From Swiss-Prot:
Keywords: Glutamine amidotransferase, Hydrolase, Lyase, Pyridoxal phosphate. NCBIfam families: PLP_synth_Pdx2. Belongs to the glutaminase PdxT/SNO family. The gene is pdxT. In the presence of PdxS, forms a dodecamer of heterodimers. Only shows activity in the heterodimer. This is Pyridoxal 5'-phosphate synthase subunit PdxT. Its EC number is 4.3.3.6, 3.5.1.2. L-glutamine binds at residues 51-53, 110, 137-138.
C-alpha cells in the first residue's frame, strides 16, 4: 500500500511522520512525495496537506496534477484533505483565485477562524473515533456540507466530512501527535470504511 502526500507546500513532512508511526503495524505501507503526475500514478491514496491554498492550487495546475487528481478520485482513489487541502477538493471555494475540484459537495469560506495568531486547539468528537484534539490554524469554515456525511462539528459547524472515497477536515490532525485520523484513512484505503477500534491505537 503506497500513500502519497502532495509535496508542494504546507505540512508535508508532518503527514509523513504520522504515517511512519503507523508503518510499524502496517508493514506493507510505503510513502511517496507526490510532485509529478508520474508520482500520482504509483500511489494507492493521496493526502493533500494544509498550507496556502492559492499556492497549492497554482502548482497543481502548473505540474498537471489538478486534472490528474480529479481523474484518480473518480476512479476510486481515496483522498484525505486537511485545511487548505479541503479548500482545494471542495465544490465551492468562494474564492475566484482557487477553483475547487468538486470532490466534496461543500461550500467553504477561507480563513474564517481569523489570523494565525488566533489559532487554537480544542477537542471535538468524531464519529468512529471519539474525542480528538483538533488544531485550527487560519482554518476555513464549511458553510454548507451538501451531500457529504458530517463526522464532527464545532459550535454547530461541520469540521470534518466524508463523501465516498474522500475525507476532508478544516483542522490539522498531523500537528497533534494523535494518529487515529491517519489510521482511519489507512482503513479507508484498505476498504474497511475507516472505522477503528480506539483501544488498539497508541497515541
Amino acid at each position: 500500500m503506497n500513500i502519497g502526500v502532495l509535496g508542494f507546500q504546507g505540512d508535508v513532512q508532518e503527514h509523513m511522520d504520522m504515517l511512519k508511526k503507523l508503518s510499524r503495524k502496517n508493514r506493507d505501507l510505503t510513502l511517496t512525495h507526490v510532485k509529478r503526475v508520474i508520482d500520482l500514478e504509483h500511489v494507492d491514496a493521496l493526502i493533500i496537506p494544509g498550507g496556502e491554498s492559492t499556492t497549492i492550487y497554482k502548482l497543481t495546475l502548473e505540474y498537471g496534477l489538478y486534472d490528474a487528481i480529479v481523474k484518480r478520485s473518480a476512479e476510486g482513489m481515496p483522498i484525505m484533505a486537511t485545511c487548505a487541502g479541503l479548500i482545494l477538493v471542495s465544490k465551492n471555494t468562494n474564492d475566484e483565485r482557487v477553483r475547487g475540484m468538486g470532490l466534496l459537495d461543500v461550500t467553504i469560506r477561507r480563513n474564517a477562524y481569523g489570523r494565525q495568531v488566533m489559532s487554537f486547539e480544542t477537542d471535538i468528537e468524531i464519529n468512529g473515533i471519539g474525542m480528538f484534539p483538533a488544531v485550527f490554524i487560519r482554518a476555513p469554515v464549511i458553510e454548507d456540507s451538501g451531500k457529504t456525511e458530517v463526522l464532527g462539528t464545532l459550535d454547530g459547524k461541520p469540521v470534518i466530512v466524508k463523501q465516498g472515497n474522500v475525507i476532508g477536515m478544516t483542522f490539522h490532525p498531523e500537528l497533534t501527535g494523535d494518529t487515529r485520523l491517519h489510521e482511519y484513512f489507512i482503513n479507508m484505503v484498505r476498504g474497511r470504511g475507516g472505522y477503528i477500534s480506539t483501544a488498539d491505537v497508541k497515541r
